[in-house]
């Protein structure tokens, strides 16, 4: 792989600083996705792709770490079969980003990408990653950042659908420790977070063994495992649109 190819791979482009930060970020994201599509079209050896992503996921630069998480999300959309094949490598990098010690953007991007990846693999073969993801996601349910809270509730609800027999006992203990957060954020100051919390609360109700009157279940507003598995295919931004427009 020559130097020009390496430069194409998701590195931030030189954009005039006079542009608004949000616009610069969206342009970087756009060109990053384009570069990844070109790489898949050229069938770049995956070992090279993962080697570069692994380097950037651990780079001292928060921007490069953030870009690595975003590129993994692009990969999940563009080549879900490859993600399923190399899920252990992908999950390892995403969990590493989820535990980023200093940068909330890296953590947030990791959560959003995990939501996509877990949907693609239907929660199968998570192994001990299930524990790592659950423990960290729990800590973010009460974060001051609205976007982080929203993504954390979406991901936690998804984990409830994929716990299965293997992790039922563990996840039950986690849900019980999270009960106060679930109840508090049903009245979250951000209405979109509150709706995400309500959906997650319903997903977690079986683990809490709540009585019917406290389970928020009704004929018009009933959720089940199949629905959560369907929702898991959506990116958090799409779910946010559903919530905002009262589709859910």
Curated annotation (Swiss-Prot):
The keyword Nucleus is assigned to this record: yes
Tissue specificity remark: Ubiquitous.
A cellular-component GO term for this protein: nucleolus
Pfam family, one: HEAT_MROH2B_C
Subcellular location, record wording: Nucleus, Nucleolus
HEAT repeat spans: 128-163
Keywords: Nucleus
Protein name: Protein maestro
Gene that encodes the chain: MRO
């Amino acid at each position: 792989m020559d130097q020009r190819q390496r430069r194409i791979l998701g590195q931030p482009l030189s954009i005039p600083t006079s542009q608004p930060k949000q616009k610069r970020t969206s342009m970087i994201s756009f060109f990053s996705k384009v570069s990844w599509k070109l790489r898949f079209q050229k069938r770049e050896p995956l070992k090279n792709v993962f080697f570069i992503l692994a380097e950037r996921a651990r780079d001292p630069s928060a921007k490069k770490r953030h870009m690595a998480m975003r590129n993994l999300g692009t990969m999940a959309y563009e080549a879900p079969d490859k993600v399923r094949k190399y899920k252990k490598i992908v999950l390892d990098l995403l969990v590493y980003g989820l535990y980023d010690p200093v940068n909330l953007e890296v953590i947030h991007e990791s959560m959003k990408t995990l939501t996509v990846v877990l949907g693609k693999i239907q929660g199968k073969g998570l192994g001990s990653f299930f524990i790592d993801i659950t423990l960290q996601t729990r800590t973010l349910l009460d974060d001051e950042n609205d976007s982080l809270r929203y993504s954390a509730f979406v991901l936690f609800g998804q984990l409830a659908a994929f716990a299965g027999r293997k992790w039922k006992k563990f996840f039950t203990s986690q849900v019980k420790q999270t009960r106060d957060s679930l109840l508090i954020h049903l009245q979250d100051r951000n209405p979109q977070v509150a709706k995400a919390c309500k959906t997650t609360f319903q997903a977690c109700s079986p683990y809490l063994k709540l009585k019917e009157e406290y389970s928020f279940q009704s004929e018009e507003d009933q959720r089940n495992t199949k629905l959560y598995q369907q929702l898991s295919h959506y990116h958090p931004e799409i779910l946010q649109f559903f919530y905002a427009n009262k589709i859910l």
